[in-house]
Amino acid sequence: MNREIMLIFGTAGVPISAEDEFKAVDVLRKLNLGAMELEFVKGVYMKEDYAKKLKEYGEDIIFSAHAPHYINLNANEEEKVENSIRRIIKTAKVLNNCGKNLVFHPGYYLKRSKEVTYNRIKSNIQRILDKLEALNLNVMLRPETTGKTTQFGDIDETLKLCFELNILPCIDFSHIYARSRGVINDYNSFYKILEKVENVLGKEAIKDMHIHLSGIEYGKGGERRHLPLNESNFNYRDVLKALKDFDASGTVICESPMLEYDAVLLMKCYNEL
């Protein structure tokens, strides 16, 4: 399997048919999936030793991590900002033992302007980067494109942030679709997103992508909830076609409630293109 020139598919968290992370590795191998995102969305439950052993057992699996959802680097209360930074650092300490890509939602606008929010979030991510360097933690922070219009993280501000901080994004195409309330849902629109990534961050960013895909339901304010791929109008096939035509490589994490079943569906669909 040449990982340099292709997309590796995997699950957001432990597959449905596995009891824990070690059994998850067995399930992923059996299904020819090659990645798993450790879901710390409700808190960083994993110890560093466990992560090290997990990587030894799953040496062929690409592990990433999703930091807790209780993060707002634009919070009004300084204590909430400090707690958010701590949660990302805690995620990084665990991930450093088994993987590289650390996905997080940077925060909410609250009542601030986009510009003020951007500057506050940028400055707090810089603080995190300084701490990661001081602790010698070799992880890549990946701010995610977000699905709700109240959340910081449209495609343009995410790419600008990554360019200015020399980090890389997590491109969640389902969120982009939901945030646009279904407007961004065809091959040309998805291809244009990849062109934006390349224009802002260079070809290297296309060769080292971290992507989230899932069926999704949206309302007036964007994302409502994740759905199985085939229970949503999200046009995942055109996303895969755009990725293939653009010669993108990296990892694709399936966040559908059907986890490994939909991850296999994505992989098969991509391989048949």
Curated annotation (Swiss-Prot):
Which Gene Ontology BP terms does the record give? base-excision repair
Q: Which GO terms describe its molecular function?
A: DNA binding; DNA-(apurinic or apyrimidinic site) endonuclease activity; phosphoric diester hydrolase activity; zinc ion binding
Instruction: Check the record and name the InterPro entries matching this protein.
Output: AP_endonuc_2, Xyl_isomerase-like_sf, Xyl_isomerase-like_TIM-brl
Show the Pfam families listed in the entry: AP_endonuc_2 (PF01261)
Protein's name according to its UniProt entry: Uncharacterized protein MJ0133
This protein's species is Methanocaldococcus jannaschii (strain ATCC 43067 / DSM 2661 / JAL-1 / JCM 10045 / NBRC 100440) (Methanococcus jannaschii)
